[in-house]
Design a protein with these regions (language model features):
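Gly/charged contiguous loops adjacent to phosphate- or pyrophosphate-bearing nucleotide/cofactor binding elements
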Residues: 41, 91, 104-106, 196-322
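Gly/Thr-rich phosphate-binding beta-strand-loop-beta motif of the actin/hexokinase/Hsp70
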Residues: 32, 148-187, 205
Length: 322
């Protein structure tokens, strides 16, 4: 996440957003919140990304410019921490540091080139001929982590399916273990994916919320409608999405208005969402992910390979069996 002022200057990034927000928790007047910009880098050649659903970039800024701004601040934070920890050793050896950036498995050459261009613009590299940057796919990095930490006891010829459920997309790919020491893998299925990441939950919730707000029958541009929408979206992002368990619970959101709109589920200052409404946000997304997983398993089984399985999530939501 980045926050830009009206002069296209970054006034907030990642966790450092105090100067960008008003006391209400929303961006100050004239400040634009920019998110999901990583998806902009992978638009070229990736048809399952819908540009219509992506937030607009700041005027005069390209997707590479915005990604470079974020990487610049990430690099500055990293340098500050390393200087505190290593002191003169870091200053002396900084020019020799190699960098590794992870990218989704389904990214094409255009997406990788855009990532590298953003890294150069952010100051990670001196120029295009600097070879200290390596791009590694996120699933491959996950497989290496599983091996090095002992999470999976991977043997030569084992297949491991990596399902990377990210913010914008879900990416899947299966690897076969070629060597245990040093650990190396090779693709054994073609990468697949879809735009069914966490932001798809937000889009589904937004559609349900807008339908409820329309039942309030307020005039276009109503500040009350805008206030209800903003508070519900924030509560879904910060609370409901993480805590949903499909256990019949109702969710009450403090929308901060005195008027009651029972037809929209607003009573005593709270808008209520049923378990079924929140389930509608999750079910199509989770079912699509399961479909992608099944297709990958079928491809692996067709090659008579042994698939290693591990659960690395604490999420308790259980989708329907359909």
């Amino acid at each position: 996440v980045l926050y830009y002022d009206q002069y296209q200057k970054v006034v907030g990034w990642g966790p450092d957003i105090a100067d960008a927000l008003a006391p209400t928790g929303y961006p100050k007047p004239g400040v634009q919140k920019v998110e999901w910009f990583k998806l902009q880098l992978m638009l070229s050649g990736n048809t399952y990304i819908d540009p219509i659903n992506l937030p607009p970039l700041p005027p005069g800024k390209s997707e590479i410019d915005v990604a470079a701004d974020y990487l610049f601040h990430l690099r500055q934070a990293m340098r500050n921490q390393l200087q505190k920890t290593l002191g003169e050793v870091f200053n002396r050896e900084e020019r020799n540091i190699r960098y590794y950036l992870t990218v989704p498995a389904i990214w094409n050459d255009a997406g990788k080139a855009a990532t590298r261009a953003a890294a150069i613009q952010a100051g990670f590299l001196r120029d295009e001929n600097d070879n200290r940057l390596t791009l590694i796919t996120e699933p491959e990095a996950a497989a290496m982590f599983c091996s090095k930490t002992g999470l999976l006891n991977l043997k030569i010829h084992d297949a491991v399916l990596i399902v990377d459920c990210g913010g914008g997309t879900v990416d899947l790919i299966a690897y076969e273990v070629e060597e245990e020491q040093p650990f190396s893998v090779a693709e054994c299925t073609a990468g697949s994916g879809d735009s069914c990441g966490s932001t798809a939950l937000n889009r589904n919730f937004s559609n349900i919320l807008r339908a409820k707000i329309r039942k309030m029958k307020l005039p276009d541009g109503s500040k009350t409608a805008g206030k209800v929408y903003a508070k519900c979206i924030m509560d879904f992002e910060n609370r409901i999405k993480a805590d949903f368990r499909n256990n019949g619970q109702k969710w009450a959101v403090d929308v901060g208005i005195e008027a009651e709109f029972p037809e929209a589920g607003i009573e005593e200052g709270y808008m209520t969402f049923t378990n079924e409404e929140i389930l509608q946000c999750f079910e199509p997304v989770v079912n699509r992910i399961l479909e992608l997983v099944r297709n990958q398993i079928i491809a692996i089984q067709a090659q008579n390979r042994s698939l290693q399985v591990s659960n690395m999530t604490s999420k308790q939501f259980t989708p329907s069996a359909n």
